[in-house]
Protein backbone atom coordinates (compact mmCIF):
# COMPACT_ATOMS: atom_id res chain seq x y z
CA UNK A 1 0.00 0.00 0.00
CA UNK A 2 2.83 2.40 0.83
CA UNK A 3 4.43 1.78 -2.56
CA UNK A 4 1.13 2.52 -4.31
CA UNK A 5 0.53 5.76 -2.37
CA UNK A 6 4.01 7.19 -3.04
CA UNK A 7 3.86 6.92 -6.89
CA UNK A 8 0.34 8.38 -6.84
CA UNK A 9 1.47 11.44 -4.88
CA UNK A 10 4.63 11.99 -6.94
CA UNK A 11 2.91 12.47 -10.36
CA UNK A 12 0.64 15.18 -8.88
CA UNK A 13 3.63 17.15 -7.59
CA UNK A 14 5.54 16.57 -10.84
CA UNK A 15 2.55 17.74 -12.89
CA UNK A 16 2.21 20.94 -10.83
CA UNK A 17 5.94 21.66 -10.96
CA UNK A 18 6.04 20.89 -14.69
CA UNK A 19 3.13 23.30 -15.29
CA UNK A 20 4.82 26.10 -13.31
CA UNK A 21 8.17 25.40 -15.01
CA UNK A 22 6.46 25.39 -18.41
CA UNK A 23 4.81 28.75 -17.74
CA UNK A 24 8.13 30.20 -16.54
CA UNK A 25 9.93 28.81 -19.61
CA UNK A 26 7.27 30.26 -21.93
CA UNK A 27 7.56 33.66 -20.21
CA UNK A 28 11.37 33.64 -20.47
CA UNK A 29 11.25 32.49 -24.10
CA UNK A 30 8.67 35.19 -24.88
CA UNK A 31 10.90 37.89 -23.36
CA UNK A 32 13.95 36.58 -25.24
CA UNK A 33 12.04 36.43 -28.55
CA UNK A 34 10.59 39.92 -27.99
CA UNK A 35 14.08 41.30 -27.29
CA UNK A 36 15.40 39.67 -30.48
CA UNK A 37 12.51 41.05 -32.55
CA UNK A 38 12.94 44.56 -31.09
CA UNK A 39 16.67 44.47 -31.81
Curated annotation (Swiss-Prot):
Subcellular location field: Cellular thylakoid membrane
State the membrane topology.
Answer: Single-pass membrane protein
Keywords of the record, alphabetical order, are:
Membrane, Photosynthesis, Photosystem II, Reaction center, Thylakoid, Transmembrane, Transmembrane helix
Q: Where are the transmembrane segments?
A: 18-38
Query: Which InterPro entries does the entry link to?
Result: PSII_PsbL, PSII_PsbL_sf
Instruction: Output the Gene Ontology cellular-component terms.
Output: photosystem II reaction center; plasma membrane-derived thylakoid membrane
Chief subcellular location equals: membrane
UniProt xrefs under SUPFAM superfamilies:
Photosystem II reaction center protein L, PsbL
Role description: One of the components of the core complex of photosystem II (PSII). PSII is a light-driven water:plastoquinone oxidoreductase that uses light energy to abstract electrons from H(2)O, generating O(2) and a proton gradient subsequently used for ATP formation. It consists of a core antenna complex that captures photons, and an electron transfer chain that converts photonic excitation into a charge separation. This subunit is found at the monomer-monomer interface and is required for correct PSII assembly and/or dimerization.
* Protein family according to the UniProt entry: Belongs to the PsbL family.
Q: What is this protein called?
A: Photosystem II reaction center protein L
Amino acid sequence: MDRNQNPNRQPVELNRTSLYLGLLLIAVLGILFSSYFFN
